[in-house]
Amino acid sequence: MGSDETKSTLDTERSTVPRTGTTTKSCSITQVVLRFVLFAATLTSIVVMVTSKQTKNIFIPGTPIRIPAAKFTNSPALIYFVVALSVACFYSIVSTFVTVSAFKKHSCSAILLLNLAIMDAVMVGIVASATGAGGGVAYLGLKGNKEVRWGKICNIYDKFCRHVGGAIAVSLFASVILLLLSIISVLSLYKKIR
């Protein structure tokens, strides 16, 4: 009779304890998918920015004048943008493999989750600052600055400005993905140590 009570007590405890395996698995699938989307977004933004070169000829009566080409290497802020997104792209590859291998082993340590949470937060800062720097240059190119007599260039280099704007928009999307990853990493760490 004592064994029947023990069985019913164990069955009751099993039914009241939440299953953490399903939440961990869904969390890992979400992380892997978001890290892959992050890779695609950062790579797309890099490619769009690097291919943003445009040259123009201005025709003055009598002779055409070739003005300098507009390319991302003309601005230190856009160079920083490309480098920062390259770092984030590389990080997304490494973190995807680490996440997949950790969850395949079914042993995701608290140290690994802490490292992912810290690195995700660092990457949010890097990508957000690069997006802001690139956005500032793009805004100056679009509107100019009358106070210091910087003319707008997007009326001349329209294709270049569209590329820069597209790269910055995709980078902003990557920043949001990184923010979501950072939140998920912290929640996973919280569930692990709780």
Curated annotation (Swiss-Prot):
Lineage: superkingdom: Eukaryota
One Gene Ontology term, aspect cellular component: plasma membrane
Entry keywords, A to Z: Cell membrane, Membrane, Transmembrane, Transmembrane helix
Bilayer topology annotation: Multi-pass membrane protein
Parts of the chain on the Extracellular side: 53-77, 131-163
Subcellular location: Cell membrane
Basic and acidic residues bias (residue ranges): 1-16
Major localisation: membrane
Transmembrane spans: 32-52, 78-98, 110-130, 164-184
Region of interest (Disordered), ranges: 1-23
Keyword hit for Cytoplasm: no
Keyword presence, Hydrolase: no
Pfam family, one: CASP_dom
Residues in compartment: Cytoplasmic: 1-31, 99-109, 185-194
PANTHER family: CASP-LIKE PROTEIN 1U1 (PTHR36488:SF8)
Quaternary assembly: Homodimer and heterodimers.
Similarity-based family: Belongs to the Casparian strip membrane proteins (CASP) family.
Protein name per UniProt: CASP-like protein 1D1
Lineage: Eukaryota, Viridiplantae, Streptophyta, Embryophyta, Tracheophyta
